[in-house]
Amino acid sequence: MNEVRFHDLVDAVQQQVEDAFDDSGLDLDLENAGGVLTVRFENGSQLILSRQAPLYQLWVAAKSGGFHFDYDETSGLWRHDASREPLGALLNRATLEQGGEDVEFPGL
């Protein structure tokens, strides 16, 4: 992977995450600045997706902890670097925990 491809992949996944939240009907605020997507839930908790270009990783900070994701070229998914869990599953779980709603993240 090169840096251009990495940034394109992260831009695309952040847009997919924004779209899923927009479609969810949850009362939240989304801010995407400097390559960092911040989701602020009504209760004040946050979910943060940030890019780590030197490592070609996507990092997620949630109430339950910090998670590092690598892009899997074979499946076309971002997967947790230790458990191999897809990004969408972690986002679903974190959103349920922090926002109280079951939001699907198709294709993630």
UniProtKB/Swiss-Prot annotation:
Highest taxon of source: Bacteria
Entries under SUPFAM superfamilies matching the protein: Frataxin/Nqo15-like
Alphabetized UniProt keyword annotations: Iron, Metal-binding
UniProt-listed InterPro entries: CyaY, Frataxin/CyaY, Frataxin/CyaY_sf, Frataxin_CS
One Gene Ontology term, aspect cellular component: cytosol
An annotated Gene Ontology molecular function: ferrous iron binding
Protein name: Iron-sulfur cluster assembly protein CyaY
Highest classification ranks of the organism: Bacteria, Pseudomonadati, Pseudomonadota, Gammaproteobacteria, Pseudomonadales
